[in-house]
């Protein structure tokens, strides 16, 4: 019971931080652009939906590991991630280039353990 409440609270805080990034920061949505930003070394944090295809997920994790970029596994599916970003379409992957006023990058490292 307590764990469910904690995950809901952390999900809400992630969603509010994501909305702040969408308003004040720079980001790219989608697999191809995310991969491009990781390879260029511009991505500060990558967020993946939980129903992202395994091959895409492993490829992004591999490139992020090479570029020493943090990867956060979003607890919702791609529809919920798109809604959290304020979009009316599905978002499987997104890369945050500049967080703007949000402290999303500082708040993530405790949740994104490098494997």
UniProtKB/Swiss-Prot annotation:
Gene Ontology molecular function terms on file: RNA binding; structural constituent of ribosome
Keywords linked to the UniProt accession: Acetylation, Cytoplasm, Isopeptide bond, Phosphoprotein, Ribonucleoprotein, Ribosomal protein, Ubl conjugation
Function: Component of the large ribosomal subunit. The ribosome is a large ribonucleoprotein complex responsible for the synthesis of proteins in the cell.
A GO cellular component annotation in the UniProt record: cytoplasm
A GO BP entry: defense response to Gram-negative bacterium
Organism annotation: Homo sapiens (Human)
Residues carrying Phosphoserine: 10, 16
InterPro entries listed in its UniProt record: Ribosomal_eL30, Ribosomal_eL30-like, Ribosomal_eL30-like_sf, Ribosomal_eL30_CS, Ribosomal_eL8/eL30/eS12/Gad45
Residue ranges of the TM segments: none
Short name of any one Pfam family annotated for the protein: Ribosomal_L7Ae
Xref: PANTHER family: RIBOSOMAL PROTEIN L30
UniProt name for this protein: Large ribosomal subunit protein eL30
